[in-house]
Amino acid sequence: RLQRQYGNIDLLRTALEGQRFQAFVLDPLPGSHHWRQCVAWMVAAALLQGKPAVLVLPTMREIEDMAETLQSIGLRCFAPTQSSNGAYGGDFAILNAQMAPAERYRAYLAISGGQVRCVIGTRAAMYAPVDGNALFLILDDVCYQDADGMMPYANARGVLRLRAKAHNGVFVAMANARSVQSQWETDAAHVGATQVSGFSTPIHAFPAVTKEASPWIRWLNRDELARLADSTIGARVPHTAVRVLSKALESGPVLL
């Protein structure tokens, strides 16, 4: 399905199947669920190739949503099993500061020992002890939670890209709105390669798909109101807006 929606998505699939470093900037389609489906597809593709996956998400809300999506495709969260000896098992683990120290350390040991190959968490998960040419993904790389205010001021985006480059992995930056860094990296004409930056292949949905998935938007500026022959063009809330709001209230709530 993603192949029919995004350009350059085949390059990402090839990278996940390959053995060399590649970086991507992916612009997910609108919607609270679509980005999770994209990430789940990448995680599944990486795990099928025997590659670990590290997912750095902004807050616990995104982590819980992502865990739910991974479970919907058949992956199990690291948790106690039904065995009588109290063993733990699972396909992915969560690392965050809200966990009890014992639970967090147990998940850390499972990751470092290779028992769990997929990690999702907040900024600190960028240091997850995975080895090999893993998938390193960050969501909304411009959010303030990803910046460290202490020396050496490590940023999650730079750390993940550095790890991917050092281990011939795949780096993916996802956001509904590209960060300045991501936009810079998608222009091969001027971007320079450093340890934490360089060219990234842009992955964007086809125009027709984006138009179909996007909400209908109209800007009621003076030109548009004049075109509609609205006599209340100078009012704080023009008659056209009042009419649209009144009609919308007949079928549901309105956010103003």
Which role fits each region the language model picked out?
Residues L2-R36, V172, N176-L256:
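Conserved interdomain linker/interface between the two RecA-like ATPase lobes of SF2 helicase motors
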Residues K51-T59, A93-L95, P253-L256:
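Conserved RecA-like ASCE P-loop NTPase motor core of nucleic-acid helicases/translocases
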Residues W35-Q49, Q71:
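Walker A/P-loop NTP-binding motif
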Residues A93-P101, C143-Y153, R227-I233:
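Flexible beta-alpha connector loops of hexameric P-loop NTPases
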Residues T69, S83-V119:
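Conserved motor-coupling elements within RecA-like helicase/translocase cores
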Residues T59-I63, Q98-P101, A125-Y127, D141-Y144, ...:
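Conserved nucleotide-binding/hydrolysis micro-motifs of P-loop NTPases
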Residues A125-H167, F171-V172:
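SF2 helicase catalytic motif II
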Residues R61-A87:
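Conserved helicase motor "Helicase C" RecA-like lobe of SF1/SF2 P-loop NTPases
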